[in-house]
Amino acid sequence: MSLISILSPLITSEGLDSRIKPSPKKDASTTTKPSLWKTTEFKFYYIAFLVVVPLMFYAGLQASSPENPNYARYERLLSQGWLFGRKVDNSDSQYRFFRDNFALLSVLMLVHTSIKRIVLYSTNITKLRFDLIFGLIFLVAAHGVNSIRILAHMLILYAIAHVLKNFRRIATISIWIYGISTLFINDNFRAYPFGNICSFLSPLDHWYRGIIPRWDVFFNFTLLRVLSYNLDFLERWENLQKKKSPSYESKEAKSAILLNERARLTAAHPIQDYSLMNYIAYVTYTPLFIAGPIITFNDYVYQSKHTLPSINFKFIFYYAVRFVIALLSMEFILHFLHVVAISKTKAWENDTPFQISMIGLFNLNIIWLKLLIPWRLFRLWALLDGIDTPENMIRCVDNNYSSLAFWRAWHRSYNKWVVRYIYIPLGGSKNRVLTSLAVFSFVAIWHDIELKLLLWGWLIVLFLLPEIFATQIFSHYTDAVWYRHVCAVGAVFNIWVMMIANLFGFCLGSDGTKKLLSDMFCTVSGFKFVILASVSLFIAVQIMFEIREEEKRHGIYLKC
């Protein structure tokens, strides 16, 4: 066995998700170009990488150094670390919650999977029944008496779907209206006293509130599963009335579904599988309850009855190794680059534009990692339990040049959910602007109930339009010698806009972004930095292009 074959599952997208596999299709979209890896042009790019990347880390280290005059301003946010005697930047509240509870989550993962295997082996209890019982126990342990609020929303939506099942369009609209309204209800009444609803419920106000009292924070993920069940049920009920038979009755069809995610999404289960018990088991499924990744109800039920080929030791082992690598990468960054604390205290006075930009860039990498690591832990947990969900992030945050592709690769299971339940039902590419507005409006509201986020969603649609139009215009010149380089120039502009927008929203804020832009365009050193950074981005984009071409040469056609 060669070294390449051993390392391949650790570096390829196929090693992340069994859904990504070589495709036999041959058409204009799959045509590949000769490899550029060994050309003189790319040898120059390799030299540039060897010079620029270390300089980027060095700039971040300088900004985080105890010798930096700004160090005293953010030192109070640092904690005692465990790597090389350095302090760790544990100031991000979201990742701190995960990091501080990592041991507890790991123990829970081992306990859950061990108990489940013992119970399934020694009793006649099915996977779905075990998930129901354990899920309810976990729900109460996590949210205490607030579990009643979650169950109330679940039951109301269940009732709407089943009462109006013979009127699919009315039922669907009603489900969406109430589903979205739950986000507003929770935002305004998450701690509304039970006693105010009915006096005899007042004792509930003094009961156990759970390990996670803020139940509403994680309800957004619960809502996606609740909507998935009810929409899948309505689709199945309508097909049943039209006498459509189950799609996996024959052995041939069953084999196809085992290998085809798209078929599993619409797998026509017996109507008895859409029971209240299975509904609760799915919504409260412990490994994915807190934050996903998202799997549809149809897919979950199918995988609970049939083991997919991806549930094997080799795939799960390599996935676990990739998780550990991501976890340790985050630890090294937090110990050596204190960029989160710097951003929180705005401790960048007299730093160069290059240093400030690296503070922002590594902040974006931390945001990516703080989402990727929990998602991979929960997906690993589900894999150990026999459920294969979509991988949420198949591209590094630094390996993106397209806004559209970035959206598809970032929170991928959520994107798949949105495509299935919003984008396609509203017409898909036939009404691209309208469906995009609907999609990003829901995405904005789902993330947080704020007008600025709704405006952010609409602005994203406006920002996507130039890329969509430019792609359509220049797609006729794909064979031209200059095409790749013109695309790279456009991609550099795209990256600048995406970086500045994300730095403004998530890292530097208005003050930091204004200072960065002022230093970049109003000083000689800043202008030099912009030129050199743009050249570096141009080189990076060329590498990104070739990575995707190499994937195509191996039959991998990703849209991101």
UniProtKB/Swiss-Prot annotation:
Coiled-coil stretches are: none
What follows loss of this gene?
Results in an increase in triglyceride (TG) synthesis with a concomitant decrease in phospholipid (PL) synthesis and exhibits an altered plasma membrane lipid composition. Shows defects in cell wall assembly and stability and abnormal cell wall morphology. Deficient in GPI anchor remodeling, mutant cells only contain the primary, unremodeled phosphatidylinositol (PI) and are unable to attach remodeled PI or ceramides to the anchor. Defective in sterol lipid distribution.
Q: What is the effect of changing H447A?
A: Deficient in GPI anchor remodeling
Q: How does it sit in the membrane?
A: Multi-pass membrane protein
Q: Name one GO cellular component term.
A: mitochondrial membrane
Q: Name one Pfam family in it.
A: MBOAT
Upregulation details from the record are: Expressed constitutively.
Q: What superkingdom heads the lineage? A: Eukaryota
List, in alphabetical order, the Gene Ontology terms for molecular function in this entry: O-acyltransferase activity
Say yes or no: keyword Transmembrane present.
yes
Q: Where in the cell is it found?
A: Cell membrane; Endoplasmic reticulum membrane; Mitochondrion membrane
Q: What keywords are assigned to this protein?
A: Cell membrane, Endoplasmic reticulum, Membrane, Mitochondrion, Transmembrane, Transmembrane helix
**Per the record, what ranges lie on the membrane's Cytoplasmic side?**
65-101, 153-165, 298-322, 374-432, 475-485, 548-560
Renumbered to this chain, the signal peptide range is: none
Q: Name one GO biological process term.
A: glycerol transmembrane transport
Instruction: Give the stretches traversing the membrane.
Output: 44-64, 102-122, 132-152, 166-185, 277-297, 323-343, 353-373, 433-453, 454-474, 486-506, 527-547
Residues of the active site are H447
Q: Which residues lie on this side of the membrane: Extracellular?
A: 1-43, 123-131, 186-276, 344-352, 507-526
Q: What is the protein's known function?
A: Membrane-bound O-acyltransferase involved in the remodeling of glycosylphosphatidylinositol (GPI) anchors. Acts only on GPI-anchored proteins, but not on free GPI lipids. Acts as an acyltransferase for GPI anchors that adds C26 fatty acids to the sn2 position of lyso-PI-containing GPI anchors. PER1 first deacylates, GUP1 subsequently reacylates the anchor lipid, thus replacing a shorter fatty acid (C16:0 or C18:0) by C26:0. Also involved in lipid metabolism, having profound effects on sphingolipid-sterol-ordered domains integrity and assembly.
Q: What else is known?
A: Present with 672 molecules/cell in log phase SD medium.
Q: How does it assemble?
A: Interacts with mitochondrial outer membrane voltage-dependent anion channel (VDAC) POR1.
Q: Which family does it belong to?
A: Belongs to the membrane-bound acyltransferase family.
Q: What is this protein called?
A: Membrane-bound O-acyltransferase GUP1
Gene expressing this chain: GUP1
